[in-house]
């Protein structure tokens, strides 16, 4: 309650300050006094925010036994707007409980909701790296270059999605996995790399066949009624080549990480573990598989003339290249269509914009569920997904040894 009361006071305080600026200009107040006034207001604001903010990073404090097999993994969380150290601790504790791994929270300190939103606009529209971005960059880069870890999992929420789109280093990315919730960013990149990273004498044909994305896996989770996601990820995934990664859109409202996202997508049971079944993960979807990708015509086996929002999802990065076909995280052409008529307008959407496939032709369908496409779901309760990227590197090394 104290934290909430401070935030409410800051909203009123900051709005009053912003409203006073045009009044001061109209009254032609002395410039020196105006600067002193602004400095005083911002100084008081920082003192108040000091009650909310804490150290640069926090570690989860859940008292559970972690399997030794997870010692080579590093989980990092970057919070969104208006999150002080208390709420950050609650977020990383919930994540640690969900995935049974220690989680480090890199604190994106709050300056109050109004000023935080202004910072979001600065970071997103001008790609400006604030001090928060630089601190987070150092934490992630240190983890990537640390030989003690062979997998780095980055979880981003809200404004953390903006900062994550700015801080991802351009080297050592094969160890990195990124999962976002309510992403407020306007872009998310994932450049290509090929086996020449590991093999010096690979020929051009083999290289083309093994071109993959630099970051092993990117997934974005969003609520259709989350206003932050609406002017962030749900808006900019419509633009080709701007947002890479698989998108999971759940019908629903709310933006808070624990209360709205994790409780809906990774609900806990009475024993403190993630339930094996929940409404969102059990949503039935249809994966369209390619039969002939060289034809100019496209045909859907689902009902024609589906309305907007019915569940038809497209690959959106607009590249048409057979060398990349069927390589995007197990989705043959990354076009998924909702199959449960009883759900209606509340259908869950899954979109894989990692896929470079432009044309979808003569498909045959197979029914799967949301959980079958969610890699993050495979981490629940301390489990792990198959190490696909590591297997690829090992196979590449074996091929090099045989040449």
Language model features: what each stretch is:
Residues 76, 128-136, 143-154, 167-168, ...:
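Structured catalytic/translocation cores of nucleotide/phosphate-coupled proteins
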Residues 1-67:
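N-terminal alpha-helical membrane-insertion module
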Residues 133-232:
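Serine-dependent carboxylesterase/thioesterase catalytic core
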Residues 121, 193-197, 235-239:
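Short secondary-structure boundary/capping segments
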Residues 212-403:
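C-terminal catalytic-base region of ester-bond hydrolases, centering on the histidine
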Residues 1-8, 63-150, 186, 347-350, ...:
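Active-site catalytic motif of lipid deacylating hydrolases and related acyltransferases
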Residues 93-94, 169-170, 238-240:
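Amphipathic alpha-helical scaffolding segments
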Residues 56-60, 111, 193, 197-200:
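Structured alpha-helical bundle/scaffold domains in large eukaryotic membrane-trafficking regulators
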